[in-house]
């Protein structure tokens, strides 16, 4: 299937906004491209994990009304003018190559590196995750993923069973395996995410450690650690289910939450967890709690 690639020039100040607007306009995927071959290290909380010169690229179906997309972007950005943009047709195999060319290694905490497969890890002795996002994206560039990865780096789940709820590309579950988890169950509502998780687990030689399921197919005993990087609304709705999935004295890590949503997300968890805000990056927060 052919695609249309809409590319917009961006600065670190507006790249995240453009990414969100492209998603809202119907982009099947959005990537952030380094325009100057600059290595990207995961910065401290509160700073933006973007290159100095960034291109924001949205992938649209070939029959998309691109002028309507551009008009929507301009309306949302006003009074700021629409950035310089380019539109190119792209075959499936070209998109995969473009993604791999533009996704650069990133470091999280003291030990974790996320690298595209086929790329020589900058620190071979570190804990390196080789990642191809496939159709279910999650690469560490978004603050919510970055905060979860740093939490895992600081609290390695050695010999623990872990649930990665909303596994996407499998990045958090694979990181947990690499950091010593005994077993990880990835759960996602999107079958493509399950495929991406299993493919990425194979690339990282942890396929024996992680298995992915649709929610209806998942049955498990309570685990010592549950990770969920999804959205505030589903997190609130899932609080009773998560309380059953986490063992007494076990831990839960939640992200995908805007700062102003933190209190409303914590509220349904307080009946079963001692939960608090543990990190904030830009407008996003990460919550962590212990099961009573």
Pin down the residues of each PLM region.
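Amphipathic alpha-helical repeat scaffolds
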Residues: 200, 228-229
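Active-site capping/gating segments
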Residues: 257-292
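Conserved short alpha-helix immediately C-terminal to the canonical SAM/SAH-binding motif I
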Residues: 192-196, 234, 261
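N-terminal auxiliary segments of SAM/dcSAM-dependent transferases
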Residues: 2-124
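A short acidic, Gly/Pro-enriched loop at the edge of an enzyme's catalytic core
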Residues: 218-226
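Conserved SAM/SAH cofactor-binding pocket of Class I
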Residues: 135-219
């Amino acid at each position: 299937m052919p695609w249309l690639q809409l590319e917009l020039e961006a600065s670190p100040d507006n790249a995240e906004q453009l990414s969100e607007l492209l998603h809202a306009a119907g982009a099947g995927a959005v990537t952030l491209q380094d325009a100057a071959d600059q290595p990207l290290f995961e910065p401290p909380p509160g700073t933006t994990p973007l290159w100095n010169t960034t291109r924001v690229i949205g992938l649209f179906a070939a029959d998309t009304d691109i002028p309507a997309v551009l008009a929507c972007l301009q309306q949302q950005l006003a009074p700021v003018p629409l950035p310089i943009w380019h539109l190119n047709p792209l075959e499936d195999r070209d998109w995969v190559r473009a993604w791999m060319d533009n996704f650069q290694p990133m470091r999280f905490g003291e030990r974790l590196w996320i690298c595209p497969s086929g790329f020589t890890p900058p620190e071979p002795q570190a804990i390196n995750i080789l990642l191809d996002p496939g159709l279910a994206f999650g690469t560490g560039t978004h603050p919510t993923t970055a905060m979860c990865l740093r939490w895992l780096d600081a609290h390695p789940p050695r010999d623990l069973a872990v649930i990665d709820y909303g596994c996407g590309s499998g990045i958090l579950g694979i990181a947990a395996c690499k950091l010593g988890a005994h077993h990880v169950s990835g759960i996602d509502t999107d079958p493509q995410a399950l495929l991406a998780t299993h493919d990425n687990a194979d690339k990282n030689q942890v396929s024996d450690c992680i298995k992915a399921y649709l929610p209806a197919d998942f049955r498990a005993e309570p685990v010592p650690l549950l990770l969920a990087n999804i959205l505030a609304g589903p997190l609130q709705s899932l609080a009773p289910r998560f309380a059953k999935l986490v063992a007494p004295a076990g831990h839960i890590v939640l992200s995908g939450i805007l700062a102003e949503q933190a209190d409303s997300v914590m509220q349904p968890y307080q009946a079963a967890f001692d939960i608090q805000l543990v990190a904030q990056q830009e407008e996003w927060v990460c919550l962590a709690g212990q099961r009573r």
